[in-house]
Amino acid sequence: MPLSFGGHPFFALFIIMEILDLHGVRHEDAEFKIHRFIYRASFPCKIITGHSAAMKDIVNSVIKEYDLKSHYENYVNNGCLVVTEHRNG
């Protein structure tokens, strides 16, 4: 049964994602943690990088190794990447 808002029906879709939070993780430890997370994760999943450009580079490097894709969670928060599987076609 759809929910209603102002008399208009709408449907809510919630996707539960696994999250890796890299706040407080040293750059030299991050790559191992990201590999371990990606290996075990189901997709889509989130990786919170914070605003560190170096941490974002590390995350993107690992994501490329697995031929995965990522995008920012939203335009306001560029400290969180959503990682998705690469689909050919």
Model-predicted segments: where are they?
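Long, charged, low-complexity intrinsically disordered regions
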Residues: 2-89
